[in-house]
Amino acid sequence: MCEPASEFELAQPDDWHHHLRDGAALATTVPAAARQFQRAIIMPNLVPPVTTTEMAQDYKKRILEALHASGAPAGSFDPMMTIYLTDTTPPEEIKRAAESGDVKAFKLYPAGATTNSASGVTDLAKVTATLQAMALHGMPLCVHGEVTDADTDVFDRERVFFKTKASALLSDPTPNPTPNPNHNPNHNPNPNPNQAPALLESAPGLRVIFEHITTKEGAQFVLEAGPNVAGTVTPQHMLVNRNAMLVGGIRPHMYCLPILKTEEDRKALLEAVRVCDRIFIGTDSAPHAIGNKENSCGCAGCYSAHAALELYAEAFEKAGMLQRLEAFCSTNGPAFYGVAPNTTRVTLKREEWTVPDSLPFGDTVVVPFRAGTKLQWRLQDRLAA
């Protein structure tokens, strides 16, 4: 029998779904992200939400100031900004974002789906022209894939979304087209907003990323979709099921949205990751102050940036597919977003260590995912190309 590998080298990963928060929290979140990743797609659900290119650029400036203050070298981390899509986002904002070079995607939150999502989209028909402009300018759409109606069980919100809503977002499954100067983004060839084909026909080439998929239905949807559709998966949804959050007591630091699912769902995610190059890393690292998690109405989100690659390595090794880790973390995402993979390399070394019970977070602390437990892999310094 072969001895297990003592170390594993891979191209520097990126994170295609990351929450840094704002203000004093950046002193913790930015250097942690920069240690793990070269680039990260930064979520826009601040208060107020990042709804314009100018707001995204101002937020990026604050992130880079925090990076500099941490002592990290300039250029060691590239925050790729996103804009929060609302019912009133004009098509002109897509053009401004695309031309800025700072904004890499727009984020669609169904109103009320997760933290700070009250300003999210209430009806896809209201953003048809904006989605058309995104396809025209090659701007991807990141989607939080859950329904939010009160009659749907929280554990079924993603299942219902993929059974009833997801197809309305999909474009013709062809490669991203060259922008057509004669394309009219306000023209809708199917005027009935209640029919899914309206969006399929009106936004050809739109690239869609279904973020943090958690169910067998979500995994199957991405597997069966065309080349313009991708998915991301978090470390917690690969490692544990809902028992970890609920059995033997409620563990608020395991609570995230989409919520942890069944063991059957977890295994379906692992199998999809094993076979599909359009599924890639997206930690959804989402820190909250300890007091906002440990109370009678705690916030959703797991903070995983402190050990993201170590957590993914554990999940991949347990699933017997460590050889797929580099594709998932380092090459699948850049290929879908149309950017070059990183040339620097990192090493994960087999080394047992204990995750701290808490980490600084502004004037309080954040409890990281797997706090107080032992991990078997540890990230080493970056290597030259």
List the model feature ranges, each with a label.
Residues 23-30, 88-98:
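Short, acidic/polar
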